[in-house]
UniProtKB/Swiss-Prot annotation:
Species: Bothrops atrox (Barba amarilla)
Tissue specificity statement from the Swiss-Prot or TrEMBL entry: Expressed by the venom gland.
Gene Ontology cellular component list: extracellular space; membrane; other organism cell membrane
Pfam family, one: Cathelicidins
Descriptive protein name: Batroxicidin
InterPro entries in alphabetical order: Cathelicidin-like, Cystatin_sf
Amino acid sequence: MQGFFWKTWLVVALCGTSSSLAHRPLSYGEALELALSIYNSKAGEESLFRLLEAVPQPEWDPLSEGSQQLNFTIKETVCQVEEERPLEECGFQEDGVVLECTGYYFFGETPPVVVLTCVPVGGVEEEEEDEEEQKAEVEKDEEKEDEEKDRPKRVKRFKKFFKKLKNSVKKRVKKFFRKPRVIGVTFPF
């Protein structure tokens, strides 16, 4: 009976040790491919995204047991997710969404963990355009108000209130959809 206990204990110890052994080396190119594959499968987008640009990481260590960071830019393609076509066959959309992504690989975890954060490019320019549109809209509204001087003050106040409410809702909706997407997954080696 004691022999059986020790044999079982030895098998359990070996299994536990083998899972904590070093991970398979992951080159920078493989890490980019894996990150892109994870984004396309987990982000919930309708279109596939393809690598537009990768920032070289000279300090990338494929044998590292710590964390590794990579930065890259992806762009929306004409291919849909459900088509399951190779990315090389998918051209970029003319006005496709461009995302700047940062990926963190945590190799010290068992199993290793990847966390991706992607944010749309051009957020500042879009905000400036939105402000210009709002200013133009306010000017038009002021012109209309001058024409509508015969209306009661109550109607004017309600109109002004609902205009502010509309602009506020528009702004919040745009902000909501600009939030970065964060994806975290574990992957086996």
